[in-house]
């Protein structure tokens, strides 16, 4: 069995790790970074860019770049236009996953086909399925989807086998937030509860700074930058840097020269100071939202802050002092610092991958479903079948009946959420069980079964116990993709892979041809009388042919003209080398003649005489 890659597919950055020698190891990307920006873009030439190179071009080419796509995964109608083509969040995420896969293969020297991917604990069914679809599009078999806080606890608790620990994992990433409470003991990791917000993260903190800068600039210059894409991208980058700097210093300066120009063409600049106090004031409501989730998680787990043994902070945004202090003051304990908040989730994913591959032993992960799942019943009521924070995998059944006499069919409306009214919850899917024999209302027995697998993905079955007729569905919700769509996207991804390969081949072919032209021209200059006039003319003609080919788009013509020039140059280069050897040999013989007589005949071993010698000091 090959390596199984553990992937933290993050909103802002992604990270990957594998088990090597029984221990999790973070794999650097092709650029040498231990995390990869979750950014995708296309250059002005149409080349696909992923990671750091895509992030670098966002300021100059914001219309052909996308970041934080994770915030939209699972949204069925959402698409982003890049280089004139619409892409779903799954396709964009697949590009990021594909880069991670390719970089891991280059680092490990072996093919990677399987993965464990992490998601926020509060991701719903459609978001989980969409993440799994993204992996499939990227050419990866997703063996398991696990929750990010759970993965972080695996990273923390791998070597802590003695005694029971109750830990609170506070995960504030780039675009999502959740908090989970787990119990660790004897290699068993059991999730007791989870709560959170899939649309709250570091991006929102950055946005508050961006809005502040836009407003301050408008006051000073009377110019609104909110509709200037290029300026906004520069502001967003500056806001992120300011947020990071304010984690370590009391104030920072945002200086952006030539941010725009006024109506007279006069350039305008931004030069604004931001204090940590200002930043904390503009983001205090965001921090407060996370407190409510912590309270809910504790309540669901039937615990108090005194029951928590350890606090783990995950995600780069937890470095913000206001966040750190909130958690510390609420729980009454200093958060555990011996864990890298940017890498812990990927390390945990690698550990779970190691469990699946048999490389890691004596670890059992008991995760939970974050939201209640049920169906709509008479009167628009949401009837739960599986309550939130139920350990998964889980399978539960309940008997329902018809609402009207002689009702021939029933619609199963599948819901996810905590509201008692069906319309207030999220619809995961619908299907119809028909063929019910005529009978008075309440008499037919319809058994509805909910089955949540180890990835947290739901499968529903409805069966008429009287006739044995049944209907089932693996939820293909608004954010999910059909098998046909996934297959099309896989082929599309493969097509792009071929395009990328072809583009790379073209660049290398042209570079080789250019280098050869330069080398051939130098050879002509240095050849002198070694090359005949005919050979020189042949090389000059071959150079001209190759230059003409390089001006066109025919790659095969470039290759053939390159080969022709190589052949012409080779003959002259060989003659030049032979001449150089002769000159070197003649020089060596002249040197020997000058130093004394030498034997002109060949000597056999019998003619060789071993001589004693004595060193003579001529100064004596």
Swiss-Prot record:
Residues 604-620 have a biased composition (Acidic residues). Acts as a chaperone. GO terms for molecular function: ATP binding; ATP-dependent protein folding chaperone; unfolded protein binding. This is Chaperone protein DnaK. HAMAP family: DnaK. The keyword ATP-binding applies. The keyword ATP-binding applies. Keywords: ATP-binding, Chaperone, Nucleotide-binding. Residues 583-603 have a biased composition (Low complexity). Coiled coil: none annotated. Belongs to the heat shock protein 70 family. CDD domains: ASKHA_NBD_HSP70_DnaK-like. PROSITE patterns: HSP70_1, HSP70_2. PANTHER family: HEAT SHOCK PROTEIN 70KDA.
